[in-house]
Amino acid sequence: MLNNIVNTIHSDKNQKGTFFIETWGCQMNEEDSEKLSGMLKNIGYKNAEDKNQADIIIFNTCCVRENAELKVYGNLGALKGLKSKNPNLIIAVCGCMMQQEGMAEAIIKKYPFVDIIFGTHNSYKFPEYLNRAKQEGKSIIEVWDKEEEIVEGIPVDRKSSTKAFVTIMYGCNNFCTYCIVPYVRGRERSREVSDIEKEIKELVKSGYKEITLLGQNVNSYGKDLEPKVSFAELLRHVNEIEGIERVRFMTSHPKDLTEDVIYAIKECDKLCNHIHLPVQSGSSRILKKMNRYYNREDYLNLVNKIKEEIPNVAITTDIIVGFPGETEEDFNETLELVKEVEYDSAFTFLYSKRKGTPAYDIEEQVPEDVKHDRFKKLVEVVNKSCEKNNKKYQDRIVKVLVEGESKNDKNKLSGRTDTAKLVNFIGNKDNIGKIVDVKITKTLSFSLEGEEV
């Protein structure tokens, strides 16, 4: 592991200026942006609330779906005018999208005003690239094809002062046929337990109450370490860290979620009763084409085991509609599975062709109108399930970690239960950052309302 690498890259802390980071994509991207922000603040820069006033603009991109890429193109085009007015403006583009073959060159060709392009494997070197861009006055492209060892000691500028992401591993070895992630994030690499523990203890000192352990597939954690450490062992270890009050994790691949992990959640008091368990499809035939390594029966057996051991657990999921070759029968199997599991919530997506993935070349693509029709039906079923689960909370007193003011009503506070339910409630603002009791007075499809007691 490389430690305190940032200090060796760029020691000048007298930089003056502002920066703006726009992030698309998953929680891993969000944490990457927090690290970019941390590095910039470490050398003297400050956040700009408006990108029009920034000296540095960074777009941290996602390529999991086409829509995310289109947003990047549109937003990049809008920066041309800003660059014309302010030639000293530094524009950087990074993230998963840049790891795609030929993408960096295509971006520079279409948007020659971009100053810096870098990928997911070397974001820790951004201060160096920034320095070079200022001195050399020409575009810098630094996209590494292969991942290197994990870099520790990068400063992190976290958005929340209450809860934090803690990455425990990077990359993915699963190669689902629809997914670009293994190609742009590299192979699985686990952080040492001691490094994870150190980061969490530092968060506790700073007043954080909740952490979310992050990885593309957290259940594979530790397989590459010597000696090997299981994810369940890590969970039990983290549960013993004094001061942290809640521990979450995501994302779990169903094929790797062991009984030991289920027992750890059941037995460890700080582990939240919430599991995000992406099913992607309810059809065994489609799951095989997706290369998911489990079938419908396997998944349902796992869900039943989870519910048997953790009675009050909340289960959420991801579902893809319109995977190539999906028939009406396949889709109906997905609907029936959603009804049977009764998810607390679900992220639903239209299948998006990703160049470089095996599914891209499958000829039997589902027509767009059929995909949209199925998507609408799925959302209706999911929403009914969410509403049904939320109604169980009516008149109950639940513990809520107060995260801040409600986005929709400044007179209310907002937070989440250990089952990840969003609660907007009337309460004391002095309790922001604390866990309080809230009586639920109203249930909605996607949130709860209540009063602090």
Curated annotation (Swiss-Prot):
Residues annotated as domain Radical SAM core: 158-388
Domain MTTase N-terminal residues, every copy: 17-135
Stated role: Catalyzes the methylthiolation of N6-(dimethylallyl)adenosine (i(6)A), leading to the formation of 2-methylthio-N6-(dimethylallyl)adenosine (ms(2)i(6)A) at position 37 in tRNAs that read codons beginning with uridine.
Cofactor requirements of the protein: [4Fe-4S] cluster
SUPFAM superfamilies: Radical SAM enzymes (SSF102114)
Domain TRAM: 391-453
Species whose genome carries this gene: Clostridium tetani (strain Massachusetts / E88)
Enzyme Commission number(s) of this protein: 2.8.4.3
Annotated residues for binding of [4Fe-4S] cluster 2: C172, C176, C179
Family: Belongs to the methylthiotransferase family. MiaB subfamily.
Residues reported in the UniProt entry to bind [4Fe-4S] cluster 1: C26, C62, C96
Alphabetical list of SMART domains matching this protein: Elp3
Cofactor detail note: Binds 2 [4Fe-4S] clusters. One cluster is coordinated with 3 cysteines and an exchangeable S-adenosyl-L-methionine.
Reaction(s) this enzyme catalyzes, per UniProt: N(6)-dimethylallyladenosine(37) in tRNA + (sulfur carrier)-SH + AH2 + 2 S-adenosyl-L-methionine = 2-methylsulfanyl-N(6)-dimethylallyladenosine(37) in tRNA + (sulfur carrier)-H + 5'-deoxyadenosine + L-methionine + A + S-adenosyl-L-homocysteine + 2 H(+)
Pfam families the record matches: Radical_SAM, TRAM, UPF0004
Subunit structure: Monomer.
Keyword Cytoplasm listed: yes
GO cellular component, one term: cytosol
The protein's enzyme class: transferase
Keywords: 4Fe-4S, Cytoplasm, Iron, Iron-sulfur, Metal-binding, S-adenosyl-L-methionine, Transferase, tRNA processing
Compartment list: Cytoplasm
Protein name, per record: tRNA-2-methylthio-N(6)-dimethylallyladenosine synthase
GO molecular function: 4 iron, 4 sulfur cluster binding; metal ion binding; N6-isopentenyladenosine methylthiotransferase activity
